Amino acid sequence: MATYSNQHWLLSHIRNSFISTDDTGMCETVMLSDDMPKHYLRKFNSSAGVESHRRRPLKPPLASALPDRNTRHPDAPMQEVDFMCYPGLDLSDDEEDMSTHSFDIQMYPEVGAHRFRSNTAQKLEKLDIAKRRAARIKSINYNEEVQPPEDKDFFMRKEIPNIKPTIPKEKKANDDELSDEGVQSMLTEQLAKSPKQTQNKFIEFARFDGTSQVGMQTKRINVYLNMLPEPDRNYPLKVCVLSTAKIQEVIGFVCYKTSLQYPDVPLKSLQHYGLYMTEDNDDMEDFPPLDNREPCSKFGFSHLTLAERRPLAPVTRVDYPGQLGNKSMTSEDDKATLADAALRALKNITLNGGAADPGGGAVGGGEGDGDGDDSPHDNVKEYEKRLLNHNDMLEAPMHRSFRLNIIDKRFFKSDVTLGISGERIEIDQYKNAKFWPQKKPVSTPIDLVAHCEIVERRHLKALLRIWLKSNSSSSSLPSGCTSAPINASVTTLNTGTGSSSAGIAHSPSSPGNSFGFFMTSNIRFKHYDFDTDTHTAEQINSKLNCILEMRSSELRREFLQQRERKQERQQVKKQLKL
C-alpha cells in the first residue's frame, strides 16, 4: 500500500477503514456527516473551469500566419483558493469510479451502504431471543412417592407339601435302634438316583487343548469320526490343539472330545486308531496313517479322518534252498511253483493271524483245552504289538544317529556317534574329545553285520554289542575292533549259571569276555561294545535287528547257527559235569 503514489486514494482508504472497523459507531457519525474530499473535489472542478475561460487568449493577427516558435508564453499566475485540498487530488483519473476509494470494501447496488453488525449486537440479539423463549417455558418439580417394601415380601413362607412315601419298615435289631439309617438327605437321594460316573480314560489328553492356551502356537483341524453313525459321520469335529502335540496325543485329544460330545459311542484304546489323510467330502485316501511320533505341526492337512487301523497284509516268505536270492525267475515252472507256494501259505493263514492246523484247528487263535484259550484282552495286546512292530519295520531303514561310548581293549571309553541306516552303520569319534587322539571313522555295509544284542543291564546303563564280519587284512578302528587267529581259544557264552563272570562287562580282547570269535572255515566275527543308557540301547537293538531280519542275509544265518551249536555244546558239557 505504501508504494501506491496516489495520496488521495490512500487518505480515502484510511477513512473507509476507520468507518468499517469501528464497533462503537462514533467514527461513522463523525466522518459520514460530510464527505469533505468529495466536497473539495466538486469545488475544485468548478473553480478550475471559470479560470480557464478567463485566460482564453485572443485571436492572432492574420499577417502572422506562422507562429513564432521562439516566443515564450509566461506561466499563468497562481490562483488563490480559500480551501486546502488533499494533495494529489488532480492526479486521480477515475474519481467517478466507486471502487477507487477502497479495494477492500465493495459497495454493491443491491446491498446498499448497510454495514455488517458487530459481534456485540449479534450476542445481544441472541440473549433477547433466549429470554423470550424462557418466558414461555414453565418448570414443574415432580416428586415421586415411593412406598417402602414390607418385610413379608422378602421372607415369604413357602408351603411344602407333606408327602411321605410309604416304605415298608424293616424290623431292626436291638443294636440298631439308635442308628439313623432312616434319615437321608436330598444329596444322598440325588447321588443314589444319578448313574455312576466313571472316570474318562482320555482325561490326560485334555491338556493339549489349544483354546485355553495364551501365547502358544495352536493348530485347528477338522476331524471326521469314522466310528459314528451315518448322519453324524458326515460332519467333522473341529478341534484346536497345541502345535507341539504329537499325532498320538492328537488322537487322544480327539477321543476325549468325542467321549464328551458322543458319550454313547464306545471307544477303544489309542493303538486301535490312526489319523488318515482325507478330502473335504470325507473320502479317506488309500495312504498309511500319519506317524504317531511326529508333531502335528509337521503336516499341513486341514481335514483328517480318525478311523481304526487297517489290518496288516500278511507277509509270506518262501525260501528256496540251494538258490541265490537274486536269481532271475525266467522259467514258467519256477513261476508256477512260487504261485502254488503262495496259495498254500495264504490258505494256512486265518483272519486272526494264526496259522491253520492241518486238522482244521488254528494255532494260537482257535479254541483249545485248559489254559490254552486266548482271551479278548490277549488278542488286543497281540494286535497292538503287531502294530508297533509294523511301525518299527517301516522306520528301521531310515538313517538315525546315536551318541554313546565305545569300550576299547584297554577298558577305556570314548565318545562316538553311531549312525544306523538300511545300507550301512557308521562309527565316528566325537569331535570334542579332548584327551584321546582322533581316530579314523568306520563305515561298514549292513550286509557285513550279523547280530545286535544287549549283554548287560544295570540300573540306568546297558552294555550293547554289535557283531559283524571280521576282515583281518584291514582294520580301521583298532581300539574297538579286535581280531583273533583261527587257532585261538573260543570262549563260551555266559548264561548266568555256573559262571562267575556273568553280568560283568568285559573288553573285546579280555579272556573273560562273554562271547569271543565265531568262525567257520572261511568266516570270522568280531564285535564292538558300547556303553549307553537303557532306553538308547533298546532303540538301537530294535532298529538294527529289524533291519537284519528284513534282509535275512546268509551271514546272519551262519552266525545264529554257530551260536546255537556252541550253546548246545556248552549245555552238554554242563550235563556231563553233573
Curated annotation (Swiss-Prot):
Its recorded name reads: Stress-activated map kinase-interacting protein 1
State the source organism's domain of life: Eukaryota
Per the database record, which ranges form the SIN1-type PH domain? 398-550
Tell me how this protein assembles.
Component of the target of rapamycin complex 2 (TORC2).
GO:BP terms for this protein?
A: apoptotic process; TORC2 signaling
TM segments?
A: none
Q: Which Gene3D superfamilies match?
A: Pleckstrin-homology domain (PH domain)/Phosphotyrosine-binding domain (PTB)
What does the UniProt keyword field contain? Apoptosis
The role this protein plays is: Component of the target of rapamycin complex 2 (TORC2), which transduces signals from growth factors to pathways involved in proliferation, cytoskeletal organization and anabolic output. In response to growth factors, TORC2 phosphorylates and activates AGC protein kinase family members, such as Akt1. Within the TORC2 complex, Sin1 acts as a substrate adapter which recognizes and binds AGC protein kinase family members for phosphorylation by mTor.
User: Any one cellular component term from GO for this entry?
Assistant: plasma membrane
Biased-composition ranges for Gly residues?
356-367
GO terms (molecular function) for this protein are: phosphatidylinositol-4,5-bisphosphate binding
| Homology family | Belongs to the SIN1 family.
User: Which cysteines does the record link by disulfide bonds?
Assistant: none
Species of origin = Drosophila pseudoobscura pseudoobscura (Fruit fly)
Where does the CRIM domain start and stop, copy by copy?
Answer: 184-309
Instruction: Cite the residue spans of the region called Disordered.
Output: 47-76, 354-379
